[in-house]
Amino acid sequence: KPNLSYFEALGVEGFKLFERVLKVIPDDMPIIADAKRGDIGHSSKRYAHALLDHFGCDAVTVNPYMGQDSIEPFSDYQSKGVFVLCLTSNSGSQDFQLPHLHLHVAEKVRQWNRHGNLGLVVGATHPEKISEIRKISGPMPYLIPGVGAQGGELEKTLKAAKDGTKIPC
């Protein structure tokens, strides 16, 4: 799950480095571009093209704040995964995502998932919320970052997420 911000900070050389990194990742390992994109439809279309066509990533993280039309250009790539930020692992997530916004996001993403390629980003720092979100989202994949340095505990997270759904971490 390469975080694009570290590559973008290096300018053109960073994009060249990103391409080199992608080439050494084994073909059987999915590449999730941790980009957290979210923009108007036309801009999102260009971001989707760059990450899913040009760079050939298998999935991408996106921000739902601008609504469905900012996510559709990504989800229209039906063979690619799109992980929508729902309840993130950073400490500031409580500023907006709690107590209720994350539930609204889960509901909307479930409604928008017409191609079956949407999933949610749900931080491991909130294991007590995972089953609550699952009741709303249904059986879609979750990307669960935040184990380790950010404070999420693997055992608590796995226990909370246990429902038979394959969960990429």
Regions found by a protein language model. Name each.
Residues E13, R46, D69, H104, ...:
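Conserved active-site and cofactor/substrate-binding residues in soluble primary-metabolism enzymes
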Residues Y6, T88, A124:
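Residue-level signal for short, function-critical loop segments
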Residues A35, D39-V121, P139:
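Conserved anion-binding
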